[in-house]
């Protein structure tokens, strides 16, 4: 009777699978498996996610890598990277793993207290992970990603500020600048990005403003310019779904009855963020003028 081959795990080292009899050497080049990194594979039917790639990367590191940045955030439950994004790791002293397709290896200093064991390697603790998010990539994205980490309560602005005290790491100036722009109240990455762009344009509305009229709650809005009584709303995809449209119409009518104007920003409009900011600036000026004439 033919001996049944061992089941393949979701990620595995090819030579180990061959040694254990789960695969033949030729199978590593065939349709049964998909290569994730050199020598590391998954069965073809397994859905490849960024978290799976992180686990695959752990099999390349032999205890000398620290998963960090957006990759560590994914493992900790905040989806900041896709299956096609490279896995972010820091190489510890003695590490012989070099940068390769799908693996972003950085050789920078990291304190022993800044990471903990995970899989076959280590994972950055939340403050170090967030520092690496804040200090890398475009500033607008860094703030948006850090907002999501803060909203998930993996760390806080206060803990990050304390972590930054006395540090002189490469990227610390940029990380401090980005942290100053963070706001855990942001409910979506587009809102975060819009807030940062408005900030640099000299526009400073109150995020997640709660609006009342005659002592009664009217609505909580994405951004509110209180002096001008202007609301700026990011109109996400959910607004066009089912009964959400009807609820939105009622909400908009209540805001207008309370004396507020509404300016919408859509996903499609954010393709040209400079135009979006110009339009918001114009809406603020018009609202300010209307208020002046009203009084």
Stretches found by the model and what they are:
Residues 1-171, 285-295:
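Short gly/ser-rich loop at a beta-strand->alpha-helix junction or flexible surface loop bordering the NTP-binding
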Residues 16, 20-22, 150-295:
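Surface segments flanking catalytic/ligand-binding clefts of nucleic-acid enzymes
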